[in-house]
Amino acid sequence: MANLRDIRKKIGSVKNTQKITHAMKLVSTSKLRKAEEVARNSRAYALKLDAVFDDVLSKMKNQGIEDIQSKYFRELERLEIKKVDIIFITADKGLCGGFNTNTIKKVLACTNEYKEKDIKVRLRGIGKKGNEYFSFNGIEVLDKINNLSSMPNYERAQEFMKKVVEDYLSGKTDKVIIIHNGFKNMITQEIRVKTILPIGYQIIHQNPQPSEAQETITSEPSGSEDEILDSLAEKYVEYSLYYALIDSLAAEHSARMQAMDTATNNAKDLVKTLTISYNKARQEAITTELVEINAGVEALK
């Protein structure tokens, strides 16, 4: 009978866990819908910003301005890279499947790839899980910030990028990339690697959706060319990080929703298995008791 009590306890424990994971799935689903809407709107703004870049560059070239002196812009193919900063974005919480692990693996892969080319790499971390991993493994992270990936905030992202831009303009780094797990759809996330500094001319055209972004854009640049481009570049770099944070958050909720759905289904299967084991054990106990009773009756005859 002790075995039956143990199985009953296990069934009760698994059912409680099932309720928790199901509730977490519902919460993640609700948060995902909101995050997806924010990501969609932010994507539209990012396309508008790209369109402004394209429009200004086109007008400058039409005016005969071919050589751009701004430090933000470089021909990436001709640039000699010696130092790279990697900004990675992970979640502040777990229970989201391989969401954080996949990002960390990509960061490590990129780091090793650069080091094989004798390129110095510095890490800048956003998200508790990623920062904890690298800290635990003795890997230095230059800047660490938590509670930003779970609550994207433009001002905090802007403040974070100020240090990055200062290091880039002062020559402490030659290239800055962002690595994060992005939202593709309700059930799929994908690792994204984006170079944000220097801004190569081809980056402006990496989102070829002119009907969505360029249709209503009309810009009249005033002031020096470098001032215009520097101002736009600062906004572009800041918003690139902010959009990555929003994209990452939507992907995180998607991954957690899937993970909790899988956990809930696994709990259901485990309850079924334990219930079968319980019924078998109960039947065996009843059979044993009947055999013992019959044996006792026979002994009394």
Swiss-Prot record:
Disulfide bonds: none annotated. It is found in: Cell inner membrane. It is a peripheral membrane protein. InterPro entries: ATP_synth_F1_ATPase_gsu, ATP_synth_F1_gsu. One of its GO terms (biological process) is proton motive force-driven plasma membrane ATP synthesis. Signal peptide: none annotated. One of its GO terms (molecular function) is ATP binding. GO terms for cellular component: plasma membrane; proton-transporting ATP synthase complex. CDD domains: F1-ATPase_gamma. Keywords: ATP synthesis, Cell inner membrane, Cell membrane, CF(1), Hydrogen ion transport, Ion transport, Membrane, Transport. Pfam families: ATP-synt. Its main location: membrane. NCBIfam families: ATPsyn_F1gamma. Belongs to the ATPase gamma chain family. F-type ATPases have 2 components, CF(1) - the catalytic core - and CF(0) - the membrane proton channel. CF(1) has five subunits: alpha(3), beta(3), gamma(1), delta(1), epsilon(1). CF(0) has three main subunits: a, b and c. PANTHER family: ATP SYNTHASE GAMMA CHAIN, ATP SYNTHASE SUBUNIT GAMMA, MITOCHONDRIAL. Produces ATP from ADP in the presence of a proton gradient across the membrane. The gamma chain is believed to be important in regulating ATPase activity and the flow of protons through the CF(0) complex. This is ATP synthase gamma chain. The gene is atpG.
